[in-house]
Amino acid sequence: MGIKGLLGLLKPMQKSSHVEEFSGKTLGVDGYVWLHKAVFTCAHELAFNKETDKYLKYAIHQALMLQYYGVKPLIVFDGGPLPCKASTEQKRKERRQEAFELGKKLWDEGKKSQAIMQFSRCVDVTPEMAWKLIIALREHGIESIVAPYEADAQLVYLEKENIIDGIITEDSDMLVFGAQTVLFKMDGFGNCITIRRNDIANAQDLNLRLPIEKLRHMAIFSGCDYTDGVAGMGLKTALRYLQKYPEPRAAIRAMRLDKSLKVPVSFEKEFALADLAFRHQRVYCPKDKTLVHLSPPERELSVHEDAFIGSFFDNQLAIDIAEGRSNPITKCAFDIKDSSMQSFTKTTITISKRKGISKTDISNFFMKSIPPSKRPTKSTSLIDVTNVKVQRTHLANDISSEKQSIKSANEKAYVTPKSNSLKPGFGKSLSDISNSATKNENVPFLPPRTGVSKYFKLQKNTEKEIDEQVPSQSNNTTPTSAKSDSASPQNWFSSFSYQTPNSASPPFSSLSHTLPISALAKIGHDALNRKNHASLPSRRIVYKPPSSPSTPISMNPRPKGILSLQQYKFR
């Protein structure tokens, strides 16, 4: 569950990072976090106790992704329940039952998407699911440890013993246990948010420079897995009380005087037990192969306190649980002869190792998890076509064939004509580029050009009509002649030349080039010709007073610098 609002409070210390920054190091992973995310893929099957192993793919994908970036993962799973979390586990069980009933009702009504959401909330990750994942991880050479009780305390202990260099989790109370480097919200590509203990101690905000003791007390006051805390108290309120009363007992006495807070009668005892669970919970030591405390207690604990943080059991059972041979809840060995276990052991190994991974090609690394039918296919592009030469086309000699080719070019895509010089198989290779080349079999042959096409002639006639409608005011401008069907090179050059406009003529009126004039340009020509020697309007607006009304309202002179109502509205 974590501490509600803790990540939001520590947002200034959050840094966006990537797991590749930890290349060459070992990171501990909360395995149950991956399993809880993976149950979304098969929530319906797990809710109705159907055999499935779909949830293994997500966890294995994440572990292989860490290996790809040079990180050595160490997966840690939860063990048996703590007596101090009995009330929390009971509430979670009730919520799961309610979600299952609601999901079953939605499934019967045909609302399958909503039902699957409820089924994913009601699924409880069991030690059998963790055991299957342990076997699958071993096939890929990935190590794992099952904690005697909670994976949070086990991960922090491994970090204190320098067995791991950081922790990947979604549980914010990892910081309350005393973790130094925590990676939150890691996606399937390695992007994550990193919070380091040193950043909290050196925060710019003095109020957030929290030592580990104050951070732990603040979390207990607002509520955690081991106590519900004080009703109506959040993290900021708890921090304010701790800053005013550094001693927890004094802060609790001050809280009782606040009428807006509801402090339980036995909260002092709950606070002490929760503080013990965060500091001295029992964990497994891989070096000594035995159970130890997260941190050695300063005094001898009572029987009730010792049971609250997890009772002690013999070393052989601790080894069997840590290595995944025994169930951490029932303390019994897993029955491999069970039919479900036998079917799993036969099918789990199908998730084969990935070999020959190139670090520069991440797409090949994750491509094996995609079925061949759903893999993207590379489409043929123009670059893929080899030995293709550009075929030069010839202009038509006669006007009739040229008009037909121009008309066909406007109606459909241009088609390369066939020629005897084409290599065999060229049309087949070109079919990937142009579909029209294969559809149109009878393409007319275009002979070499002699003369000018009628298209340019029609264009010149159009320009001539426009020049007649918009006469030029410059005497130096000479219209382009378009009398003959064939234009000489000299006429062709003059038709594309620009005349120097007369300074006395309006703008754009003396240009005699033969480019086609748009409708908007023609409107501009007409407007300038109607007003001789007119210039384009400037941005400066000269105010003209309105005509005086028949009955003036006021004849008082207006002071200099004061705008009239018409001027004000116009501006």
Swiss-Prot record:
Binds 2 magnesium ions per subunit. They probably participate in the reaction catalyzed by the enzyme. May bind an additional third magnesium ion after substrate binding. SMART domains: HhH2, XPGI, XPGN. One of its GO terms (molecular function) is 5'-flap endonuclease activity. PROSITE patterns: XPG_1, XPG_2. Mg(2+) 1 binds at D30, D78, E150, D152. Keywords: DNA damage, DNA repair, DNA-binding, Excision nuclease, Exonuclease, Hydrolase, Magnesium, Metal-binding, Nuclease, Nucleus. Residues 114-245 are annotated as: I-domain. Residues 464-489, 530-559 are annotated as: Disordered. It comes from the Eukaryota. Gene3D superfamilies: 5' to 3' exonuclease, C-terminal subdomain, 5'-nuclease. One of its GO terms (cellular component) is site of double-strand break. It is found in: Nucleus. InterPro entries: 5-3_exonuclease_C_sf, EXO1_H3TH, HhH2, PIN-like_dom_sf, PIN-like_EXO1, XPG-I_dom, XPG/Rad2, XPG_CS. Its EC number is 3.1.-.-. Its cofactor is Mg(2+). GO terms for biological process: DNA double-strand break processing; DNA recombination; double-strand break repair via homologous recombination; maintenance of DNA repeat elements; meiotic DNA double-strand break processing; meiotic mismatch repair; mismatch repair; mitotic recombination. 5'->3' double-stranded DNA exonuclease that could act in a pathway that corrects mismatched base pairs. Belongs to the XPG/RAD2 endonuclease family. EXO1 subfamily. PANTHER family: EXONUCLEASE 1 (PTHR11081:SF8), FLAP ENDONUCLEASE FAMILY MEMBER (PTHR11081). This is Exodeoxyribonuclease 1. It comes from Schizosaccharomyces pombe (strain 972 / ATCC 24843). The gene is exo1.
